[in-house]
Amino acid sequence: MMALCMGACSFGDSESHSIVLDTEYQGATIDICSSAVRNYLNLTDEKEIAAYLVDNNRSGQDYMMTKFAWEGDGSTSYTVHFSEKKDFVDEVTYETEDTAIYNQGVFVPGRTYYWKVTGDAQGSDSKVDTFTVLDAPVRYITMEEGFNIRDLGGWKTEDGRMVKYGQIYRGGRMNNRGGNTGLSDEDLRVFRDLLGIRGEIDLRIAGHDDGNQTMSVFGSNVNYRKAPMQGYNYIFPNFKQESPIPRECQSEFVASVGEVFHFLADQNNYPVYFHCNAGADRTGTIAFLINGLLGVSEEDLTKDFELTSFSQGGRRWRSDIVNGEFTANGVMQDDHDNYVAWRHMIEQLMNQYETESGTLSDAIANYLQTACHVTESEIEMIKEMMLENENEK
């Protein structure tokens, strides 16, 4: 897919450069979504969606990898520069001794970028190239040691606005089972320097599955909040079932949902990274509450949830799939290994907390206020920080 030429046309570069770009986009529009994810996002028929999810389960498509390559000029190291501005103000840089990099997460869908390469030899540089990133809405953050990490932004709300990119990120654990960081140095640089994380919410249960984490792996200057919970119907105070597996809400889980939203109402915590272990069930439940509160449709919330199926986490479907169709009970899994009840959770939310408006957004707001003691002013603060205004479009 090509866009208006901006590279050679904009710069009219006739100078001689010692570094020659092998990857030259010349204003092209590039897609940072894998083809498997892009195809899934475009599907609307439920039978086709069910078949596609089965075929692509654990396909490892939860990544954003864009190659940038060049011919070296004898330099021993190179710096690759990216910026949204022609003069490279506020640039992001990558250092390498190779003649190619795979960008891991700096690009935001819908924006135009400029890039160039410089070397450590005197006068070593390339021409400036440019490209535009196709609107996704999915923005994966690709890590060397992590998976299923993505920006919560990019989804359109039912009143026509968009959830901002770069505010909240979701994913899996950042520490290993021994309690230390399982991230590479480059992963930490992405979180600290490129994404600028200032708050971390840990949804895991202390002493049970959290690897004894007590502070942010991103550094002591990052605000860390433990909010232990279980996902899906466990967030409802009256949830209790006897079979097939006895399950029951604990008051701590509901209180933790409240803690999450108290944390999100404080702008000093942004950008925020929230996670459980796999970034699937507990994380998926909180992502549903956040974007649902902001006004994202149930259809898009469901697609965002099911994107985990393309990662090594696998099988996170709106309901079980039998004979090529989603079952009607809204439960994908209910056994000793896991409990996945996406559509059943939404059904119970609407049954218990629906308001006169009949909207999912208002039902979530009602749940947060009545069950979790989140205030109306906190909800408005979150919306203000997370929703795009007219002058930001």
Segments from the language model and where they lie:
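C-terminal motif of bacterial Sec signal peptides marking the signal peptidase cleavage site
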Residues: 5-8
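Cys-dependent protein tyrosine phosphatase-like superfamily
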Residues: 11-273, 286-393
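Ser/Thr-glycine-rich phosphate-binding loops at phosphate-binding pockets of nucleotides
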Residues: 278-283
